[in-house]
């Protein structure tokens, strides 16, 4: 049988351990060498965290904490917090739209009893009653009126230890803080023409973008950090915010140190990162109402942009990590929408963007230190995707958004179709944004994140502006390349090849002839006949087999055999300790792992489903251990694999180990197994469905899970190539005799071939479904 290939791989995979050990010893021996550190090593100094040194500022980066600035009167931009840092009690800030809102904030020192004080607000002397009963905290209070000649009312007090306050114009409102630190929260006042509100500050202040509101709240509650990473050291006039320094350019190459052979160069670059997401949408076979997968894929993008009057050619690769798997099941009918898995990126996910351009900075990016980067944030919003059903209104997925925030940078290598590029990998953390996403015309709504269905929303690319700085050790002669291989490989060319090969394999399912497949499944395929279709020399055949076995021994199938071996040892020892007691648990647990679950067989259907599903996961190994004359799922799996290997034009010795291992794990995921007891058949599938029925009438009988567990231990396990539903359908439409039914139950290959040659639509459809399940 074709499944012999899997048995050979399981049997022989241990033999590669010796060659691995010899290789490891040799590698350790040859790599134990002494290296002369040279003049650029820092081995004589204590451990230290290297920083970027002087990184020239540019207008592309929006600082988190911009300031401090001197007191002034101006119209703050919408969507920016003004963080006020007063040093004395009195009026802190005032603002008005000259229509229906006059608002000011007053600071009151601790331990002030109720009293009237005179404040100058909008140039007018005002008598206001104030108090602060706190012994330690300062009190900010908002005073507001809605007419120019009206009286002031007090709102939203803030008791503050750090003595900081903030105000922002956004969304038709004026936002402030209230409560008590360290638990202060934001509030707001409605105002018409809010964007025209002019504000006058009477203390030093900072400017913080709304995207960093969490940072602003942290400052309000806990105070500014002791060492502030701000633009200015002392307060400057606000007009200095728009003055561009011409002392140094943002894009320059600086010689840090130099000897006769080597030099250290600092590269400062402004960059524009453009990227896009790619996705894979796979429909299941059948009537057209089922989708098996909607997932993210790495995406390459090449573009040009201008930097200091010079055209730059850049290349990016965007990939995601930490995806969240969602699913949707509209019902049990064949015409109900089903999405087995669709990926969503959320706040626990990361986006990686590998960036390369044709500037001098990337030419010798091998020995690098002091790598630092600053990048702006960007919001990625999803679009529509229609689930095109054959009949009825189409559901569609819409919405979803995340914002990307810079979280680090490291070296990487990008692999294109022609060349590998030393590049920078920018890591972005995610935050969910409005709007939420939903599957319209279903009950799925109000979910947050960015689904993989349409992550680009019709855009050609997303864009992020930023800059980076690094110091690179390069040859003093600019005509020389750094004599070493690629720096840090984080995305292998093999992954790209495997992705293309998986797509080709899945497409080849339509080209397999069923009659030939049955004949091929009956052949005793071994490793050499399986791999003979690959275009390689005979000398490489042994190496290919060794590499396949090396990969196969780490597969889930090999791990299951190892776990089963331990279980059998435990079962044998328990029997020897208590040989007089033969319980279901002691005899079955090695194969079924349900010794603790069969305490209440008739409790509920869900309990039986759980138990049969647990048993079914190990029936594949049981079937391998007790080979019968019938055909099994692994025979079909191996035959499909062999056919696709022979037809493939992209298969290579490098990709074969991964493909064979994946095929053993992923081909035909939905399997059903049966045991026969006289005229009764017990059938259970890996997804928890179970049937018990009589052979002569196909009439269902109660399913006895304990009897099924006993039969699994003592009787041969048979792959349900033609499952119960197909058998019942065949009997209802065509009628089959008892002997013919037994042959189909035993998966007799001769009978299966006869039905296929007779072009029986029910049997052909079942075999087609199994072939379509052979996907990677």
From Swiss-Prot:
A motif (DGE motif) lies at residues 308-310. Residues 510-776 are annotated as: Spike foot. InterPro entries: ConA-like_dom_sf (IPR013320), Rota_A_VP4 (IPR042546), Rota_VP4_MID (IPR035330), Rota_VP4_MID_sf (IPR038017), VP4_concanavalin-like (IPR000416), VP4_helical (IPR035329). Belongs to the rotavirus VP4 family. Gene3D superfamilies: 1.20.5.170, 2.60.120.200. GO terms for biological process: permeabilization of host organelle membrane involved in viral entry into host cell; virion attachment to host cell. The keyword Ribonucleoprotein does not apply. The record marks 231-232, 241-242, 247-248 as: Cleavage. Keywords: Capsid protein, Coiled coil, Disulfide bond, Hemagglutinin, Host cell membrane, Host cytoplasm, Host cytoskeleton, Host endoplasmic reticulum, Host membrane, Host-virus interaction, Membrane, Outer capsid protein, Viral attachment to host cell, Viral penetration into host cytoplasm, Viral penetration via permeabilization of host membrane, Virion, Virus entry into host cell. This is Outer capsid protein VP4. A motif (KID motif) lies at residues 644-646. The record marks 101, 190 as: Binding to sialic acid. Residues 248-479 are annotated as: Spike body and stalk (antigen domain).
